[in-house]
UniProtKB/Swiss-Prot annotation:
GO cellular component: cytosol
Protein purpose: Catalyzes the pyruvoyl-dependent decarboxylation of aspartate to produce beta-alanine.
Cofactor note: Binds 1 pyruvoyl group covalently per subunit.
Chief site of localization: cytoplasm
Pathway(s) per entry: Cofactor biosynthesis; (R)-pantothenate biosynthesis; beta-alanine from L-aspartate: step 1/1
Name assigned to this protein: Aspartate 1-decarboxylase
Catalytic activity: L-aspartate + H(+) = beta-alanine + CO2
Pfam families reported for this sequence: Asp_decarbox (PF02261)
Family membership: Belongs to the PanD family.
Residues modified to Pyruvic acid (Ser): S25
Gene Ontology terms: biological process: alanine biosynthetic process; pantothenate biosynthetic process
Protein localization: Cytoplasm
The organism's taxonomic lineage, starting at the top: Bacteria, Pseudomonadati, Pseudomonadota, Gammaproteobacteria, Pseudomonadales
Length: 126
């Protein structure tokens, strides 16, 4: 049996560019890609916190240290500059891999400042 699990997440990153006339994709600060373990051209899901849009695209590398999140091509209709987004990558894991799997999560503060990283989401309480 295999399960599709969260591999990596950038939580509440701010869209810095929305470029309609660009080949499709999402450019992400290269340092963040490395920290999250997301590969260039890897499929990602983007969830727009501000307007509720959810869409699929792929990651491309932006300049290291740029703090860039650029939503490009047709996806630019779904996210505008200033929108807060959650970017996720998922992967298939075997039963054996599930026992030790931990996602890589990057949490962003305003201005796309990396606040902290984690490999677990706290238990939600009432």
């Amino acid at each position: 049996m295999h399960a599709i699990m969260l591999k990596a997440k950038l939580h509440r990153a701010e869209v810095t560019h929305s470029v309609l006339d660009y080949e499709g994709s999402c450019a992400i600060d290269g340092e963040w890609l490395d920290l999250a373990g997301i590969h260039e051209y890897e499929q990602i899901q983007i969830y727009n916190v501000d307007n509720g849009e959810r869409f699929t695209t792929y990651a491309i590398r932006a300049e290291d240290g740029s703090k860039m999140i650029s939503v490009n091509g047709a996806a630019a209709h779904k996210a505008q500059k200033g929108d807060r987004v959650i970017i996720c990558a998922y992967a298939h894991y075997s039963e054996a891999e599930l026992a030790t799997h931990k996602p890589r999560m990057l949490y962003m503060a305003p201005g796309n400042v990396l606040s902290h990283t984690s490999n677990a989401i706290p238990v939600q309480v009432a």
